[in-house]
């Protein structure tokens, strides 16, 4: 066990060192002229102010929960909760700061060409990715080492590492607040800016005359960068912890090694992801997306070859009971190695499937663009249809992965497949954080009045960034589905371990009631999220209209808008609106568990997983398709910018924005928090 912890801690430190080195390389690049630096400073000031206020609010909620967990469960669990929350927040805050510094340098590098701008944008994203996996693995492995150090021989591994559930809960709490609050901010700004700027005033995106333009750029950083970092930090840590707990419960021999085996897989993938980052380079005449995917493919290939010796090392002496038969030695090694391969294959499938439904190169997006030629309503109908259809292939891929992984190594096989999938988080976050960096770089170029040659570089980078953001959301949702299933397995085994053995029979009315309540939660949460964005966007619309009316000279460029007003309004709105929906997944399992019992609570867990998976995929894929349908028309198809088709596509994109960037992604942490809270309260049931 000690070897696994040492390897994980060393690999996590390597990821942090790599982040530090690339931060230095990014900061060494030119930040452009004074106008560019002024815009970047305004974006950074707004993003920092928002995150500080968000973390202050979370801190107040977290302090109350820390005391409750400490008194009701254990102080080790409470300490884990605090550690998970702090590290998750730190990953998001540091990633956001690097993103803001990378934006302006990417815009300046675009003067020199596509390859130079791509290099800085991807490095900025890679820093965030390595911070997420480095801090996540360091936190889990480091806290595990503290928990097992000095323990007496009579203590079981599962009891010793049980406080890690607190770590998972801390990361999850930050995740849902960051995803939801950041999403409300960014889409409130985006929708408000588009409705008045593009639709009413007829000015282009990122035009400095729009009073909401700085708020829009701030939102990209707090939502797409800090929000996604917190989301995948949580998914990464939760999956590793859930697999560790399951291994400690299922294995009778080699329990310690089974508990740290997921940490070793994560450690190997960090090294693989670092190497993969160096393969992201444009070839002469090549595509930007191919350069990014090359890095992902190299990382996946190296991880594949590393997993076999790691499995031999850690699981060679373990035995697992499958269908009443003891399996160990070479057979178990190959079964577990095959399970890791399932996770890597599912990663590739989720990337390919999501790109198909959200890229301008494929029929779904082109279908929405074509539907825009006949009006706003047909655009909305087509987008909703694509979003619904986009659920089929990912869900079938997840189902196939579950079937194969279960046939190989039972529930532990599913957990290992999920761990292998999530072990690629470092380079996946790099692809995602690349998106807001290129988006902001284009905005800075527009606001600073840089030459058209710069926009000719930033625009294709931004178009690819839209697809990478959609792809990583698909990956996050698919992995969240697997992670939630592993957490449900932990819940059932946790009940068994606590001598509360139960069956979840569909003929039991309590289980059915739980399924209905669990199925309701993602819909209720999604509705609250969408309505929150609508209210925030409405306030921005009124403010932008007011400034256009009351500040003469904005439209001719002789006077500047009051950018800070929209930023401050959205900050207050996002903080206010995020609290009640974010507490929903904490309160519902507690209330159901206390008043209806553990069987109904089990139904809640399964119901939330099923409906949450479908809603999240539908929203993120549909929203991404709406966005890129607009971009497809702006590229000169179906009449291009300013045409009736373009106006209809802008409406679709405006509806799709909160779909794909607020409600959809926030459902990921929602379904996992419900499961984690259920795990936490087992002793109280």
Swiss-Prot record:
EC number(s) given by UniProt: 7.1.3.1
Membrane-protein topology: Multi-pass membrane protein
One term under GO cellular component: plasma membrane
Quaternary assembly: Homodimer.
Recorded name of the encoding gene: hppA
InterPro entries listed in its UniProt record: PPase-energised_H-pump
The name this protein goes by in its record: K(+)-insensitive pyrophosphate-energized proton pump
Residues reported to bind Ca(2+): 627, 653, 657
Functional note: Proton pump that utilizes the energy of pyrophosphate hydrolysis as the driving force for proton movement across the membrane. Generates a proton motive force.
Top-level class of the enzyme under EC nomenclature: translocase
UniProt keyword annotation of Lipid metabolism present: no
